[in-house]
From Swiss-Prot:
Keyword Iron-sulfur: no
Coiled-coil residue spans: none
Compartment annotation: Spore core
Inducing factors: Expressed only in the forespore compartment of sporulating cells. Expression is sigma F and sigma G-dependent.
Compositionally biased residues, Basic and acidic residues: 27-36
Chain residue ranges for the region called Disordered: 1-48
Keyword set, alphabetical order: Sporulation
Main location: other
GO biological process assignments: asexual sporulation; sporulation resulting in formation of a cellular spore
Protein's UniProt name: Small, acid-soluble spore protein N
Length: 48
């Protein structure tokens, strides 16, 4: 059971998210960051 190599992952790489490297999470903000300099278009929804 411990020698399970599926999906081409190395044995030492866990598949659950809690043990991913910190760099993996830290980089997400830069990808999502808006660098266009424009203000966001605010769409009014019901009840606002």
């Amino acid at each position: 059971m411990g020698n399970n190599k599926k999906n081409g992952q190395p044995q030492y790489a866990p598949s659950h998210l809690g043990t991913k490297p910190v760099k993996y999470k830290a980089n997400k903000g830069e990808k999502m960051h808006d660098t266009s300099g424009q203000r966001p278009i605010i769409m009014q929804t019901k009840g606002e």
